[in-house]
Amino acid sequence: NLYQFKNMIQCANHGRRATWHYLDYGCYCGPGGLGTPVDELDRCCKTHDDCYIEAGKKGCFP
């Protein structure tokens, strides 16, 4: 969810940039996702997206 996304971004960037700067960052931070993550932060967003996809397959929508 967006609250978790905000916390993840703040932890990853140590508060250097506002969270909203990352709503359209790389290939996976923000809605959708396709391709190869551009860096560690984008890879973290991909992992988060993948987790939601797997949870949805099991009928769980956190």
From Swiss-Prot:
Reactions it catalyzes: a 1,2-diacyl-sn-glycero-3-phosphocholine + H2O = a 1-acyl-sn-glycero-3-phosphocholine + a fatty acid + H(+)
Catalytic site positions: 48
Keyword annotations: Calcium, Disulfide bond, Hemostasis impairing toxin, Hydrolase, Lipid degradation, Lipid metabolism, Metal-binding, Platelet aggregation inhibiting toxin, Secreted, Toxin
Cofactor note: Binds 1 Ca(2+) ion.
Gene Ontology terms: cellular component: extracellular region
Signal peptide: none
Subcellular location: Secreted
Binding site for Ca(2+): 28, 30, 32, 49
Enzyme nomenclature, EC number: 3.1.1.4
Pfam families: Phospholip_A2_1
Tissue expr: Expressed by the venom gland.
Role noted for this protein: Snake venom phospholipase A2 (PLA2) that inhibits collagen-induced platelet aggregation. In terms of inhibition of platelet aggregation, superbin a is more potent as superbin b, c, and d. PLA2 catalyzes the calcium-dependent hydrolysis of the 2-acyl groups in 3-sn-phosphoglycerides.
Name of the featured protein: Phospholipase A2 superbin a
Organism annotation: Austrelaps superbus (Lowland copperhead snake)
Taxonomic path: Eukaryota, Metazoa, Chordata, Craniata, Vertebrata
